[in-house]
From Swiss-Prot:
Region Disordered, annotated ranges: 89-150, 164-222, 401-451
Keywords, alphabetical: Membrane, Transmembrane, Transmembrane helix
Organism: Invertebrate iridescent virus 3 (IIV-3)
Family per record: Belongs to the IIV-6 067R family.
Name of this chain's protein: Uncharacterized protein 004R
Residue ranges with Polar residues bias: 104-121
């Protein structure tokens, strides 16, 4: 019998595809513009570097004759101590590990090699460039740790660079690199990858349009700041602005109570102060012009009365002239509005104090009342009633739901209403009258008698 626990082993072999499929490596090009100014907190950015494109700048090569002096914190006695670093020996004197196939990897002169320093590896002290004719300086066998680390990184970069050059034409690449470096001796030598990107952009193979810088965007769309940033930067100014808003809200409330029929916009503490102020000034200007037009209408009516009286005494038949002109007052409306806009003066600029204007208005209304009574006695025309109808004072009061009229609170009529004598109630209480006989009771009594 076969054993119960049979273990079966499977061998899996990887079979190549019948068609040689190319291996595609995704390439993600670097973005030329990241717009970091729109993402980071601007208070942490140097104002001089705001909206400036970042260009990586390499440290200049220090000659071997110069010495690097690094400042050290002061000693106990307060004197500054400077440490002088000796020149670093030439890199060519350091033995370079030979690659696996030295025949296929051509040697490249030191001038043709260009390397990019990584941001995470910054060798310190800096590598000092020496002249070709000068022999390597003798240095102690014990080297700092930073120099040894730098040389290791240098060797790895050189070996990777050899591999890249070995795949193409070594001599052509070397000559192009030498000529390029000799052409720009004072500038920093660029890396092969950077050179390839630059040549690609110059030849126009990269058809993608470069994004605009942040300066061009702000010129086109404007520099709109977020209003929620640094709201309490100036707290006293914000507090004063809130006080002005409360004052304007109170003024708007008074305007609604004084002019209930006028549509006045509503505002809150979250509204803009400048918008509230402009709206209040424009609303007050419109109401002031309307009030001035009404005053001019009263002046016109007073002039019509004077013309009727004067021309009537001369011999002209002027009876009903004031009434007829008052009914056609709408013809004067346009000219009166234009005159009111022309003579508009803000209350803060008005030279006459409010007390004098109040007394003048009272005298003017008294004069109109007296002249209207005089004309009413002579012509039997109630001009005062016409004036009240014209001014809108005799409109029927609005009745609320509970049955009471709105009265003076609604702004439709005066609290003092003139009541004629014929309609006045008697102050003496009426005598009580006896209740008469009921018709139904008499009929019921007669029917009982007949029965």
């Amino acid at each position: 019998m076969p054993p119960k626990n049979n273990q079966i082993t499977y061998n899996i072999f990887k079979v190549d595809h019948r068609f040689a499929l190319p291996r595609v490596r995704p390439k993600f090009p670097k973005f030329s513009e990241l717009y970091l100014e729109l993402l980071v907190n601007r208070s942490k950015v140097d104002p001089q570097l705001m909206n400036e494109p970042y260009v990586h700048r390499y440290d200049p090569v220090v000659s071997s004759g110069e010495s690097m002096v690094n400042p050290v914190p002061p000693a106990d006695d307060g004197r500054m101590v400077a440490t002088t670093l000796k020149a670093v020996p030439r890199l060519s004197s350091v033995p370079n590990p030979s690659p696996a196939k030295p025949t296929q990897k051509p040697t490249i002169s030191r001038e043709s090699f260009v390397w990019e320093s990584s941001a995470s590896i910054d060798p310190s002290p800096r590598v000092q460039k020496k002249s070709r004719g000068r022999p390597a300086s003798s240095t102690p066998s014990i080297e700092p740790e930073s120099i040894s680390r730098y040389r290791q990184v240098k060797r790895s970069i050189i070996s990777s660079y050899y591999k890249q050059v070995g795949e193409g034409a070594p001599s052509t690449t070397r000559r192009a690199a030498d000529s390029e470096n000799e052409r720009r001796p004072s500038e920093v030598r660029e890396a092969p990858e950077s050179r390839r990107r630059r040549e690609t952009s110059e030849t126009g193979s990269d058809k993608s349009k470069a994004p605009p810088p942040i300066k061009e965007i702000k010129k086109t769309f404007g520099n709109e700041e977020n209003p929620l940033i640094n709201v309490f930067e100036d707290y006293p100014q914000a507090k004063d602005e809130d006080d002005h808003k409360r004052e304007l809200l109170f003024k708007f409330k008074r305007l609604r109570q004084t002019y209930p029929k006028v549509d006045i916009p509503d505002f809150t503490m979250l509204s803009n102060h400048e918008t509230m102020k402009r709206t209040y000034d424009s609303t007050l200007r419109n109401l002031s012009i309307d009030s001035t037009v009404e005053n001019y209408k009263s002046y016109l009516m007073m002039g019509f009365m004077a013309c009727e009286m004067v021309l009537g005494k001369i011999g002209f038949d002027m009876e009903g002239y004031t009434q007829q002109q008052t009914l056609h007052m709408n013809k004067y409306e346009k000219l009166l509005v234009e005159l009111g806009e022309k003579s508009y003066v803000p209350n803060s600029v008005n030279k006459w104090p409010v007390e004098v204007r109040l007394i003048g208005l009272m005298l003017f209304q008294t004069t109109i009342f007296i002249i209207s009574k005089i004309i009413a006695k002579k012509t039997n025309v109630n001009l005062l009633q016409i004036y009240n109808n014209f001014s809108g004072l005799n409109e029927p009061p609005k009745v609320t739901r509970n049955g009471s009229s709105s009265g003076f609170a609604s702004g439709t009529s005066s609290p003092l209403v003139f009541i004629p004598r014929t309609k006045r109630p008697s102050l003496v209480p009426s005598e009580k009258k006896m209740r008469g006989p009921s018709v139904t009771r008499d009929l019921a009594a007669e029917q009982e008698r007949d029965a």
